A protein has these predicted regions:
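N-terminally biased helix-coil "hinge/interface" segments that flank
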Residues: 1-201
Length: 201
């Protein structure tokens, strides 16, 4: 057995692509990634959860660094987001704001389903628990996610946007090595263990 952390990934992040599947809106699992990124990054990317947050005023464009576009000196492009959502909304017979809000709700439901699945699998009752939000967009969805899960408390660390990197930087360095012997336990195997351990050092 190899040591590992039980991590469940969910395709509902800021880069999750919004697209039509027949007459239904789909969120993820495809991601725009960092390149080209969301439509607002000015690199020709698709509509994403980030763009939905921007359209609904949950992202403050004037607070973003001007690092977008071909010369990397422009703010996020709110105009292209409005235009692209208008096209998507027309195809669905809805308003752009309703489509964006629906996309966020789909993302929250996807995240909530993953948390429920993991907690049920482990036999844990999360009622009365605390939802810890981290990541660049963690705070944008934490309260809606807590409501969806029936949780009353959300912990949003002041460094939530860089919490993973911060934790990695604070962790003690260590090296763990192992070898698979593929043999039945016997006196001969026990006698050979010191040599095997020496090779791992």
């Amino acid at each position: 057995l190899a040591p590992r952390l039980p991590i469940e990934t969910v395709a509902a992040g800021g880069g999750s692509v919004l697209e039509l599947q027949g007459e239904r809106l789909r969120v993820g699992p495809r991601s725009a990634g960092a390149q080209p990124g969301p439509a607002c990054y000015r690199a020709g990317g698709p509509l994403t959860i980030t763009d939905a947050n921007l359209l609904l005023g949950r992202l403050q464009v004037d607070r973003f660094p001007a690092v977008f576009g071909p010369t990397r000196d422009q703010p996020p492009d709110a105009e292209v987001v409005r235009h692209r959502f208008a096209e998507l909304a027309a195809a669905l017979g809805q308003t752009p704001e309703r489509v964006a809000s629906g996309a966020l709700q789909l993302a929250v439901e996807t995240m909530a389903a993953a948390i429920r699945r993991v907690s049920l699998h482990r036999g844990e009752d999360i009622r009365g628990g605390v939802l810890v939000a981290y990541g660049g967009a963690g705070g944008q969805h934490a309260c809606r996610l807590a409501d969806e899960l029936g949780l009353n408390t959300v912990l949003l660390h002041p460094m939530a946007g860089v919490l993973s990197a911060f934790g990695m930087g604070q962790a003690r360095q260590r090296c763990r090595q192992q070898v698979h012997l593929g043999a039945a336990l016997s006196p001969e195997l026990l006698a050979a263990l010191p040599d095997q351990m020496e090779r791992l050092m």
